[in-house]
Amino acid sequence: MNIVQANTISPAIRKLISFATSDKKVEQEYEKYILLSNRTLYSVEFEGEIAGCIGIEQISLSECEIKHIAVLAVQRGKGIGSKMINFIASKYPSIVAETDYEAVDFYRRYGFFITSLGEKYPGVERFLCQYNKQ
């Protein structure tokens, strides 16, 4: 895992963040990782190429919120997402994330406790995912 600190966003990181937020918000979200001391963006490589990224916001010394997590479509199913969660869980015993229906099973398989937040946006059910290391 590598901390992403470049002042300009690379095409690979731009693409990954766009999977987790709208295209219009990519630059704004990336800037938060550069400017805010409680936010960190990590990338992971597979076969020499950036294959995924995970961005967190530190809530306390023992808790963080996953703000973005994404893996390139061609690299999915290879354990890259789990590797990123393992890395974050090694640093923070308590992790929270908010996600949609498409990603909720990923968190559930990892051992997150899932709570429906209902329709936060018209037609879009959101879920709160909470993980506490035993």
Residue spans of the language-model regions?
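Conserved beta-strand in the GNAT
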Residues: 43, 49-58, 62-70
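Active-site beta-strand termini and strand-to-loop segments that position acidic
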Residues: 45-47, 131-133
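Conserved active-site alpha-helix within GNAT-family acetyltransferase domains
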Residues: 82, 101-125
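A short helix-loop-beta-strand connector motif used in the catalytic cores of GNAT acetyltransferases and
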Residues: 32-43, 65
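Short amphipathic alpha-helix that is part of the acyltransferase structural core
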Residues: 1-28, 45
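Conserved GNAT acetyl-CoA-binding A-motif
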Residues: 90-102
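Conserved acetyl-CoA pyrophosphate-binding loop and the N-cap/start of the following alpha-helix
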Residues: 75-87
